[in-house]
Amino acid sequence: MGAALTIAIDGPSGSGKSSVSKGVARRLGLAYLDTGAMYRAATWWCLHRGEDLADQAAVAHAVRVMPLVMGLDPSGPTVHVDGTDVGEAIRSTEISTAVSAVATNLDVRAELRRLQRAVIEAERTPSGFAGGRGVVAEGRDITTVVAPDADARVLLTASEEARLARRSLDVHGTADAAAVEATKDQVLRRDRDDATVSQFQVAADGVVTVDSSELDLEQTIDAVLAVVEQVTGRVVGPRQGS
């Protein structure tokens, strides 16, 4: 495919960032970095250490010394903290409820941005997970603050109805009215909290918006690949499932 490719994908909760980003990475043989999982891992670590999440200085210090290892395989991404696989634990309701307190800490954001940029840069070298082919990185701030010079930058959006249904399926295994209602506060509160420290609801200059409200997963992956080809001028691969 030629030179290393960095693809940055941002968007609100439930827009499909993770599934689409993993799918794009699998199609193109790239590494996959879930920056949101890094904030969740930081939250797990702080709670594991017994930190008061309201103590911003203590939380920032804890995150600076956090022994975090991100597995970048899009077919099975992993998250380890201090040798513990926290991939399932960081998706718990406890972490989902607490993560905003960590993610809105500006010193934490600065530290995790540093780590994220280091991963992205490493994936442009032959020693990276994908052998220098590049990375798909997804999450808050990724298109504007973390990787504003990415080869392709996408803002993935969807209607509130579609986002709530997707997150309900993800968390509860169903998108019936009760599940959607149970998920609504968590999704909208996270977006509201994150909006105080990052811009992810309106595309910045050079960022292409893809609305997935009426698209299924494979169609959305195709749409993102089309954007990558459009903005890079590179044929990035066949348009079929992995």
Each predicted region: which residue ranges?
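N-terminal phosphate/diphosphate-binding loop that engages ATP/GTP or pyrophosphate donors
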Residues: 26-94
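Pre-Walker A (Motif I) flank of P-loop NTPase domains
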Residues: 2-6, 131-133
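Conserved lysine of the Walker
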Residues: 17
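Small-molecule kinase domains that catalyze NTP-dependent phosphoryl transfer to phosphate-bearing small molecules
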Residues: 71, 116, 120-124, 139-145, ...
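P-loop (Walker A) phosphate-binding loop of NTP-binding proteins
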Residues: 12
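ATP-dependent NMP and nucleoside kinases share a basic, alpha-helical "lid"
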Residues: 87-173
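Hydrophobic anchor at the beta1->P-loop junction of P-loop NTPases
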Residues: 9
